[in-house]
Amino acid sequence: MKLKHLTIFLFIFIYRFLFVKSDCYLINNERPETKITKIRCDDQVISILLNPNNRTDATLEKDTDGKFYFDVVNFPYKDRLCDYTYDIYFLPEIPSLPSVPTIGGSVNFTYNYPCTSVYGRIKPLNIANKIVTPYNINLDQFTMRIQPGCGDLIINSGSRVIYNASYQTGDIPNKPTIDDQGNITIQGSNLYNTQIKINSNDPVENLNPTGNLDSTHSTIVFSLPESQYQGNWTIDVTICDVFYKSYLYTFLPIITVMEGVLNDNGGNLTFTGDHLSVNPSTTISGHFGGKPISCFAGTSKSVICSIPSRSEYGGSGYDVPLNVTIGKYTTNTIKISYDLPLIQGVSQRGTSQIFNVSGVYFSGVISMTIITGANIKTNILKKPTPTLEEPGFFIESNNTIFIFLPNNTQPGFMNLIVGDGGSKSFTSPRYNFKITPTITAGQSFKSNTIGGDLIISGIFMRTVDSDGRDVPLTVKSEPGGPICDPLKDGDGLSFTCVLKSGFGSSHTMNVYYNLLPVGSFVVSYNPPYLASSDQEKDGTIQINGNNLGESVSNSIITVVYLDGSRANGTVVESSHNLLTFQYPAGNKNTASYLFQLGDQISNMAGPFTLKPVIENNNPAVPCGGGMVTINGHYFFNYTKDTTTITIGKVPCNISSINVTTIECVILPNLKSLSPYYTSGSKPLIISSSNSATEKVYQSSITGYSNYTFAPPTITNTSDIDQTALITIYGTSFGDANLEILIDGKPCTQPEINIHTYSSLTCNVTNYDEMLKYNYSNTKFNISISVDGQYFIAQIFQFKYESTISYSENKSSGFPNEMYIGIVAIIIFLALIFFAIKTQVEKYIEERRARKAFRSVDNLRLKLREKHAAEIAKHYSFGYESAPKPNKSYFYDLGKKLSRLPLIRCCFKEHTD
């Protein structure tokens, strides 16, 4: 033994002094597993080994004791520093590690003092008693693979712990699920070493099932026989031997469906579901339609019950409730039916009359009945090959029937009547379904703008709800579009829609049944058509035609002239057959017409040539000559130089002319003309020497072009103002030799409204006398004569109203009775005085008036003779010359007598 130890000692001694030249030493003779922070060296420069197996020199600094020291802890490359010698051993360090999941895996980290002095070998680590050797991924980082685990993560180097951490903690965010196969699934993260413990109020075989963890440690599944769970459960979950959470579950028995068919005779039927396991000591029973029935245990997913016959049950046999009680738990309730036909759904095949009826036990159906509101029944028979012409039904399968309904079927209920074993009949419950009217696609209609009845085709057009009340169809178009009011119909194949007046080339009319769209059709109004045209005296033009509509705001009339230019007229009024518009301003009287109503344009009518139209049928013709204004339209190409106007045969000289107005002047002294030309109604004739003008249009305006040289008339007067001015109103106040007499005295300086000859003003010559004598409320005669008394107005009387007011002077000193008496005497005497004075003045004024009229008559006779002679020099009419004054003594005497006031007032009109 001693020899062996001696041999080892000699080997170490020889190796150390022959092969290892150590110039550094431990300061405190630290043990190999002691952390070395500093070593002392003899030389200032030493050789050190760095990973990966690279030796380099390090320069040391001298300490205060004069020695050189190598500071291991603060060495900048300690993550690459190897042991100095085999006996100067640096304990490895791991400053930090990233979080490690329970699945483990490769981890990158910093590894200080990673290698030994022998060829720079990497120092191994120990994790959970397993050797792990890190390896470089670069000079600064190492990688090691950590095995799956949970809880503490302790890393050792030899027997020394160099890093103490933990795996990531497990987490279960959602409640574990349990499926019908007995699988308990837990999902989360870091579920390594997850276990459950089941606590139940019912006995179970295994309270600690084993789970199957997936590779990602995110799902673990525990499997149990389904029969093991029923009732209330508490599942305790532990992760890595640490309690995590408890979850509560309740497992009640459930039945979902009946297997097989329940016929009239009843029998044992199997009902499938979940959690239906029965222990030997557990009782089981059931209820069918509220009556107890016997049930037997099957499997955990089935139970068997005895169902009575339909006659024993005594009910309708449809939707009978059934449930099962297992021990202290009762299942849910399901409804089952005997094998009787039952409609479960009805659907229309597209928009046809064919309906698909789905349900159960249809094989025995022999007839069907449609029941509508008011209990109207329609029987539909079973046919091998029903058609739309011969409605009926056929059975496709035990669950499907095809029905061909009549066109006039109304919405309502459907009933099935079936055979039952050949001895009984059974009526199934009513199934309510709606038959919706359907409009035949692609229908379009044309209509005049006045509208009319439209017959809309379709099916099921007899509209009535389930209570027998009418449900009208409604028809709507776009906003502002036409209106169509549906009427009730009876055959089911169509309905009538009354289209209101409208216009437009295309309108989509949508049909609604109970506010639901059932189809549409298109309405197109016929385009407008223009035929003939007429002119009106007011200048408007009327066009006859068809489909002209009633919408002025949507109407456009276009006038197309011969040169192709266009202008729009103004539509005044429009009806379906007649259009009235105003011709556009301009100087072109020949044009064609186009009419646009909405988006439709008419034919081009014409060309038409406008004729001049006289509008006023009684223009003011001055009786003694003067201005005549002729209002009308379309005096195109009429000029002063080429146009002549005569009234009867009296010429009217044109002073101005435009498209709508002609003004002309009749020379005065009509008295010099023969009464043949100036009495009665005379035609107005407008002629032109210009070939481009049209003859005045008079054929349709009877009497509108006749004029009368009427004598003046007085209709009213104004009061005489303080300047002695009076206004006289009337007609035909001519301006030739005009004379006005008021109470026999002339009214001077007359001014006439020459545009209408209906008013004049003049100054009253005896106004001062009226004021002086206060002729208040006294009637005065007014007479007017024109053109040397050839035209004399009927005498008009007016009351003179004084503009002077009097005020009563009041005095004192007399008793009231005396004052009243004196006033009464004065008034009486004044009345007598004024009565005498009035009679005397009246006599004097009458003599003065007669004398004045005689003087005026002599003057008038001289003027008339002079006017007649002057006119005769300038005018001649046919073979007749201007009339000459009668020179006989009796003629002059008769004329003079006729001028006397007493004689003149007896005649309504003066003629020669």
From Swiss-Prot:
Glycosylated position list: 54, 108, 164, 183, 232, 268, 323, 356, 398, 407, 568, 637, 653, 658, 706, 716, 763, 774, 781, 809
This protein's UniProt keywords: Cell membrane, Glycoprotein, Membrane, Repeat, Signal, Transmembrane, Transmembrane helix
Locations listed in the record: Cell membrane
Record's bilayer topology term: Single-pass type I membrane protein
Primary location recorded for the protein, binned into one broad class: membrane
Pfam families, per the entry: TIG
Keyword Transmembrane: yes
SUPFAM superfamilies xrefs: E set domains
Domain IPT/TIG residues, every copy: 532-609, 612-686, 715-796
Segments in the Extracellular topological domain: 23-815
Transmembrane intervals: 816-836
Residues in compartment: Cytoplasmic: 837-912
Signal sequence interval, chain numbering: 1-22
One Gene Ontology term, aspect cellular component: plasma membrane
Keyword Glycoprotein recorded: yes
Protein name: Tiger protein E1
Source organism per UniProt: Dictyostelium discoideum (Social amoeba)
